[in-house]
């Protein structure tokens, strides 16, 4: 599924990025594929699990909760990123007891035949990582979500290269409106961006000359009915289109992974034409999901709406003071909404001036960039209450945005998506003071 793969390396089993149940990014992303029915058993038997970064389509707490109930001491390996991958472990309530943080660029020896090395991303070193796994001298390179894996220094002629291909992992431009953001502009932008990504990936594969290329991760869908607009607008790249582009330009063999299918790398390296090298899913295997268990996950989000902290409007000052972003000329209007992004009757609607972290009743008279963020009330309150990162809102398509002028405020978004404090606001003492 998505970024999760089960590797059998001699007598060792290794699993990448297990997201096998529940949503990612609050309620915005759901699994495209139906995981094999024995996924939990197989995950519990893993000798090691690699989790590339903290985004919830790679670090899936619903999945890890199930795993921890069976085997809390399963060995998990993560890179030593500036923001710890498991920064939110205590809050999550998931009991995992064998998380190993390893330095970048150093081989980790598993046994005499197997070793792996975690590498950082050149563009998002504070968060993203990728991995090289080597078994008996044969290398598997999984670049995961890295924009510039290992700063562009990558091994040539690996046995297998895996790299993301789909695009669409951002709220931009689907969740934007006003100004140039017409439906025609969005459609054209998305089409152009996806094509650029395909060509970039095909060129990377051509340059690195792996024996086999596998398009992965990128298998998610915006399946909640309330997100129909996003699903229809946010067109993803088709893995087969990328594979065809690669075949046109090089001798590289390609393989699109599906649940229940197997790539026998040992056989394929001996003879790329071996018909037993790629085993298709057994007859009758369900490949794509056609139903998702929305209820329990939406209930968790909904539980935040009526929380006591939101009875006191002073939560706003408390929260943004905790967040710690200021001295930046930007005024943001935050509006709580219903499912359809219409202002919620009785919901909060307020201004934050980040120049001096004040909360004015109207926009200041000085010149200032302005952004309006409408957020579904269940998600914004869940995020506020638990001190979560705003990826849930932005990458999860849970906001609608307008901005004037039309510029991306990198410092603002980077702070709320990566740099928030590691512990949530102290709502307990807030309530004692407010009570």
Swiss-Prot record:
4Fe-4S in keyword set? no
Organism, per UniProt? Sus scrofa
Q: In which pathway does it act?
A: Amino-sugar metabolism; N-acetylneuraminate metabolism
State the needed cofactors, names only: [2Fe-2S] cluster
| Family the UniProt entry places it in | Belongs to the CMP-Neu5Ac hydroxylase family.
What are the UniProt keywords, alphabetically?
2Fe-2S, Cytoplasm, Electron transport, Iron, Iron-sulfur, Metal-binding, Oxidoreductase, Transport
Q: What GO terms fall under cellular component here?
A: cytoplasm
Molecular functions per Gene Ontology: 2 iron, 2 sulfur cluster binding; CMP-N-acetylneuraminate monooxygenase activity; metal ion binding
User: InterPro entries under this entry?
Assistant: Cnh, RibonucZ/Hydroxyglut_hydro
This protein's record includes keyword S-adenosyl-L-methionine = no
Q: What residue intervals traverse the membrane?
A: none
Q: Where is it mostly found?
A: cytoplasm
Under which name does UniProt file this protein?
Cytidine monophosphate-N-acetylneuraminic acid hydroxylase
- EC number annotated for this UniProt entry: 1.14.18.2
GO BP field: CMP-N-acetylneuraminate metabolic process; N-acetylneuraminate metabolic process
The role this protein plays is: Sialic acids are components of carbohydrate chains of glycoconjugates and are involved in cell-cell recognition and cell-pathogen interactions. Catalyzes the conversion of CMP-N-acetylneuraminic acid (CMP-Neu5Ac) into its hydroxylated derivative CMP-N-glycolylneuraminic acid (CMP-Neu5Gc), a sialic acid abundantly expressed at the surface of many cells.
Location(s), subcellular: Cytoplasm
Question: According to the record, how does the cofactor bind?
Answer: Binds 1 [2Fe-2S] cluster per subunit.
User: Which chemical reaction does it catalyze?
Assistant: CMP-N-acetyl-beta-neuraminate + 2 Fe(II)-[cytochrome b5] + O2 + 2 H(+) = CMP-N-glycoloyl-beta-neuraminate + 2 Fe(III)-[cytochrome b5] + H2O
Q: Name one Pfam family in it.
A: Lactamase_B_3
């Amino acid at each position: 599924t998505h970024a999760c793969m089960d590797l059998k390396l001699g007598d060792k089993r290794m699993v990448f990025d297990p997201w096998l149940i529940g949503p990612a990014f609050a309620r915005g992303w759901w699994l495209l594929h139906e995981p094999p029915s024995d996924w939990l058993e197989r995950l519990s038997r893993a000798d090691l699990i690699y989790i590339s970064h903290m985004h919830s389509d790679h670090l899936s707490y619903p999945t890890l909760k199930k795993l921890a109930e069976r085997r809390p001491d399963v060995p998990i390996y993560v890179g030593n990123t500036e923001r710890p991958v498991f920064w939110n472990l205590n809050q999550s309530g998931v009991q995992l007891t064998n998380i190993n943080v390893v330095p970048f660029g150093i081989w980790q020896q598993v046994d005499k035949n197997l070793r792996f090395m975690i590498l950082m991303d050149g563009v998002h070193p504070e968060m993203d990582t990728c991995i090289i796994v080597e078994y008996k001298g044969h290398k598997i390179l999984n670049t995961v979500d890295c924009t510039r894996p290992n700063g562009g220094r990558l091994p040539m002629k690996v046995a297998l290269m895996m790299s993301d291909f789909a695009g669409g992992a951002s709220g931009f431009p689907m969740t934007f409106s006003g100004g140039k953001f017409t439906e025609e502009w969005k459609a054209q932008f998305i089409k152009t961006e996806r094509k650029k990504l395909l060509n970039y990936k095909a060129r990377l594969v051509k340059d690195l000359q792996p024996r086999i290329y596998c398009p992965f991760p990128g298998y998610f869908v915006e399946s909640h009915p309330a997100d129909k607009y996003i699903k229809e607008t946010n067109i993803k790249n088709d893995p087969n289109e990328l594979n065809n582009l690669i075949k046109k330009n090089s001798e590289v063999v390609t393989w699109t992974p599906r649940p229940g299918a197997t790539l026998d790398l040992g056989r394929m390296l001996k003879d790329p034409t071996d018909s037993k090298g790629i085993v298709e899913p057994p007859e009758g295997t369900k490949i794509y999901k056609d139903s998702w268990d929305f209820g329990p996950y939406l209930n968790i989000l909904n539980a935040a709406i009526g929380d006591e902290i939101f009875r006191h409007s002073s939560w706003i000052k408390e929260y943004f003071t905790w967040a710690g972003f200021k001295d930046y000329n930007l005024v943001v209007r935050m509006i709580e909404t219903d499912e359809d992004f219409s202002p919620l009757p009785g919901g909060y609607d307020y201004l934050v001036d980040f120049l001096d972290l004040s909360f004015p009743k109207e926009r200041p008279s000085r010149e200032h960039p302005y952004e309006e963020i409408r957020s579904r009330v269940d998600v914004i309150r869940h995020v506020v209450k638990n001190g979560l990162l705003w990826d849930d809102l932005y990458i999860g398509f849970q906001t609608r945005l307008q901005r004037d002028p039309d510029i991306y405020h990198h410092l603002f978004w980077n702070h709320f998506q990566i740099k928030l404090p590691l512990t949530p606001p102290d709502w307990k003492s807030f309530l004692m003071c407010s009570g």
